[in-house]
């Protein structure tokens, strides 16, 4: 029968092929089921399908794996200490509902009215009222740490529940009641520790809280819950469980499958509140616990005071007293007319005398330059002028000589004898009108400071002599004018350069000490050393010569005269001194420099000739030279005869030896005299040659100076005709000495001369740089040519070697 005919309406169901279907009717077992996550991926992998999935598609953390943490530390921001947790190594699935469980923030009973406070009954809660908002905030926030006093007591050994003080109370505490067992325990305890001392028990003092509002006694504010929602009562108390809420993480992470139920924990059925920790025996009397002792106080109130205070009545204010102070101004109109005119033109000292004050000079007052503070004077100090006036009034005045002697020998520095001695010499020099030189044991800075202090200690008469002394200390002429004149005068006079110069006493002492090999203070030399400014700054020491540009030991350094007398330096000196700097003056300087260079060359030649002569004499007789240098004036040496030495050392034979010795001495004296005569003749010849050369140089310089003067006179006549040229500086002969010859050229200013010098220096530098570049380019070209030639030689040698090898092969 055909079934298709039976389906008149709709679509017919397909036939189930029971034979072809392979679906088993048995349910799948638990170990065969596959646990999947939210996304349908397999949750467990690995050994026996018991491990978690390995994160992002079987990787750890992310695509790249764990991202390493960066550690950074600096001075401003120190590196934080990273504390690792188990959650740092877990994936999102481990923290989900199948993992360690969700975390939720829960309220605890530590702060404010939480769950623990709500679970309490009405009679278990605090009796204090929380009607005000401030009290509610105080209850919410509680101090975490105790006060400083409690912490100090705990560190000293105090524990809560015990009294404060020494453990000096001996008493028998009845523990466990009056039973036989308790008595036996107390007897055994007394045998073990008979001298045991019990500390005082702390009796709590109940603090009374004052009522702040207008409510009655025992009033409590309304709670948030209404009366209808109140669930507290006897039934809730009976059903109240002692279980506490679990902390932190819920659920288990390991050991339990996803399709299994969790076993009951053994440790969650019991609570510590179910155990009794008291040691009291059941049925014991509670009277002993109710007994309280009196507080032992170490302070007692004394009825009488040992030193009672005295209280004084306040001063009475007069009835006419006014709080505002109004000074009465001085009425100048009442002064006489003469005094009014004199007051306008008064000096500081005159004003001090007029007002009756002590005579104080500007040095004693101490201006901005003085570093030492002025000494404050009291009204009880007896002044020297007042003492003199009193003595004169009484008629017993001292003589002028005694007074002068007392002022000269006055002691201003009793604690410093060296400074007092210098002050005494300073006074002696000032009274004579001479400047006191700088002591050798003081630096420039120290002497300037001490000099100001000495000047402040002078009297008015002595201070009046200071300007004259200071004017004498200054040079008569400025260095720019005096230096060329000094050079001209030095060129006219010549020093002796022969070997007959007398050696000073110091040099003689040094030579004698060197011969005796006694090296020490006599053979030493002392020089002034100028340190660098940077060195003094590094050692944090004041510079001994402030403001000086010299560095090192100038006495041992070679002076470069050419560098000193450069045109730029000459212009700089004249600019600082304010002298007229003209082209004529520069020409004069150039001529002087040329003459000085010629003189230096001649002196070098002369010294070389002297050295050659000395070498010849040294070869002849070195001992005779030393004796002749010590005695250049042909004086006989006071020397003991040879017979005296022979008699001491045992080499003499009598009269024959004396005669022979006398003959030898006469022959030696004749030889010495001949040598001295030869030396004198040589010296005379040299002097004549030197004098001739110097006369020629002088004549030549004089001619040049005359020519310059004639040229200057011609230029002056032309300048008088020309009105366009202006004279910048006109100096008098009295202020700067004889005037310089006028120049015909237009006068150059200081800045123009310096600019010209700078241009010349720049041109020289450019020329040097160009020359160096040319040299470098030539060297580079030469090196390139050499390299090319070497390459050619190497290639040619290689070709030759190849040809030779071919030839050898052909021969073979």
UniProtKB/Swiss-Prot annotation:
Gene Ontology terms: cellular component: nucleus
> Per its UniProt record, what Pfam families does this chain match?
DUF1604, G-patch
* InterPro entries, A to Z: DUF1604, G_patch_dom
Q: Which PROSITE patterns match?
A: G_PATCH
Q: Which GO terms describe its biological process?
A: mRNA processing
Which residue range or ranges hold the G-patch domain?
145-191
Q: Which domain of life is it from?
A: Eukaryota
Q: Where is the composition biased (Acidic residues)?
A: 610-630, 653-668, 800-812
Q: For bias kind Basic and acidic residues, which ranges apply?
A: 29-40, 586-609, 669-720
Q: Where is the composition biased (Basic residues)?
A: 761-794
GO molecular function annotation: RNA binding
Disordered: annotated span: 1-42, 384-416, 584-812
Family from the record: Belongs to the GPATCH1 family.
Report the protein name in the record. Answer: G patch domain-containing protein 1 homolog
Q: Which species is the source of this protein?
A: Caenorhabditis elegans
């Amino acid at each position: 029968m055909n079934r298709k005919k039976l389906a008149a309406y709709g679509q017919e169901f397909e036939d189930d092929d029971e034979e072809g279907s392979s679906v088993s009717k048995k349910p799948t077992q638990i170990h065969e089921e596959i646990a999947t996550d939210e996304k349908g991926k397999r949750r467990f992998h690995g050994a026996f399908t018991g491990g978690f999935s390995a994160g992002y598609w079987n990787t750890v953390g992310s695509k790249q794996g764990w991202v390493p943490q960066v550690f950074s530390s600096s001075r401003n921001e120190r590196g934080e200490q990273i504390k690792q947790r188990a959650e740092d190594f877990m994936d999102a699935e481990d923290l989900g509902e199948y993992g360690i469980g969700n975390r939720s923030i829960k309220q605890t009973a530590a702060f404010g009215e939480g769950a623990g406070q709500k679970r309490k009954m009405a009679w278990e809660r605090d009796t204090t009222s929380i009607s005000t908002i401030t009290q509610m905030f105080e209850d919410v926030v509680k101090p975490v740490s105790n006060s400083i006093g409690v912490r100090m007591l705990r560190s000293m050994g105090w524990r809560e529940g015990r009294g404060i003080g020494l453990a000096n109370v001996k008493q028998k505490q009845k523990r466990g009641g009056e039973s036989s067992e308790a008595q036996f325990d107390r007897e055994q305890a007394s045998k073990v520790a008979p001298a045991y001392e019990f500390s005082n028990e702390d009796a709590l003092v109940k603090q009374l809280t004052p009522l702040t509002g207008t409510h009655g006694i025992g009033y409590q504010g309304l709670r948030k819950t209404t009366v209808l929602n109140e669930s507290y009562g006897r039934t809730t108390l009976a059903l109240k469980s002692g279980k506490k809420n679990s902390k932190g993480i819920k659920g288990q992470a390991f050991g339990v499958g996803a399709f299994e139920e969790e076993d009951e924990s053994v440790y969650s059925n019991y609570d510590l509140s179910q155990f009794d920790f008291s040691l009291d025996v059941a049925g014991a009397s509670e009277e002993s616990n109710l007994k309280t002792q009196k507080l032992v106080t170490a302070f007692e109130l004394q009825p009488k005071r040992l030193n009672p205070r005295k209280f004084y009545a306040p001063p009475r204010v007069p009835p006419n007293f006014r709080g505002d102070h109004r000074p009465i101004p001085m009425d100048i109109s009442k002064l006489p007319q003469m005094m009014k005119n004199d007051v306008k033109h008064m000096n500081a000292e005159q004003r001090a005398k007029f007002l009756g004050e002590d005579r104080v000079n500007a040095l004693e007052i101490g201006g901005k330059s003085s570093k030492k503070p002025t000494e404050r004077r009291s009204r009880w100090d007896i002044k020297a002028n007042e003492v003199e006036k009193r003595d004169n009034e009484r008629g017993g005045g001292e003589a002028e000589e005694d007074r002068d002697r007392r002022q000269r020998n006055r002691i201003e520095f009793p604690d410093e004898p060296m400074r007092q001695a210098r002050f005494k010499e300073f006074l002696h020099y000032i009274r004579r009108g001479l400047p006191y030189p700088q002591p050798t044991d003081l630096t420039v800075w120290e002497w300037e400071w001490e000099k100001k202090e000495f000047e402040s200690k002078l009297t008015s008469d002595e201070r009046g002599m200071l300007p004259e002394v200071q004017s004498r200390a200054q040079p008569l002429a400025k260095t720019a004018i005096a230096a060329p004149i000094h050079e001209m005068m030095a060129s006219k006079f010549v020093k002796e350069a022969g070997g007959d110069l007398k050696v000073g006493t110091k040099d003689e002492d040094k030579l004698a000490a060197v011969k005796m090999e006694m090296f020490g203070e006599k053979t030493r030399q002392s020089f002034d050393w100028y340190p660098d400014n940077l060195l003094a700054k590094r050692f944090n020491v004041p510079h001994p010569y402030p403001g000086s540009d010299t560095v090192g030991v100038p006495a041992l350094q070679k002076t470069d005269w050419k560098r000193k007398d450069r045109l730029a330096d000459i212009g700089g000196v004249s600019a600082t001194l304010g002298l007229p700097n003209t082209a004529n003056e520069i020409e004069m300087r150039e001529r002087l420099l040329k003459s000085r260079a010629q003189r230096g060359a001649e002196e070098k030649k002369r010294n070389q000739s002297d050295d050659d002569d000395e070498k010849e004499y040294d070869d002849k007789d070195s001992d005779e030279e030393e004796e002749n240098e010590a005695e250049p004036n042909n004086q006989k040496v006071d020397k003991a005869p040879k017979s005296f030495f022979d008699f001491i050392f045992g080499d003499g034979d009598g009269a024959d030896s004396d005669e022979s010795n006398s003959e030898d001495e006469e022959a030696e004296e004749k030889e010495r005299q001949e040598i001295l005569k030869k030396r004198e003749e040589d010296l005379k010849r040299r002097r004549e040659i030197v004098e001739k050369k110097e006369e020629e140089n002088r004549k030549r310089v004089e001619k040049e100076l005359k020519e310059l003067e004639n040229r200057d006179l011609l230029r002056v006549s032309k300048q008088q005709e020309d009105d366009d040229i202006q004279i910048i500086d006109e100096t008098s002969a009295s202020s700067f000495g004889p005037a310089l010859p006028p120049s015909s050229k237009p006068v150059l200013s200081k800045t123009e001369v310096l600019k010209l010098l700078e241009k010349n220096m720049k041109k020289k530098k450019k020329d040097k740089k160009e020359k160096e570049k040319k040299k470098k380019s030539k060297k580079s070209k030469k090196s390139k040519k050499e390299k090319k030639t070497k390459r050619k030689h190497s290639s040619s040698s290689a070709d030759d070697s190849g040809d030779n090898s071919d030839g050898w092969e052909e021969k073979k």
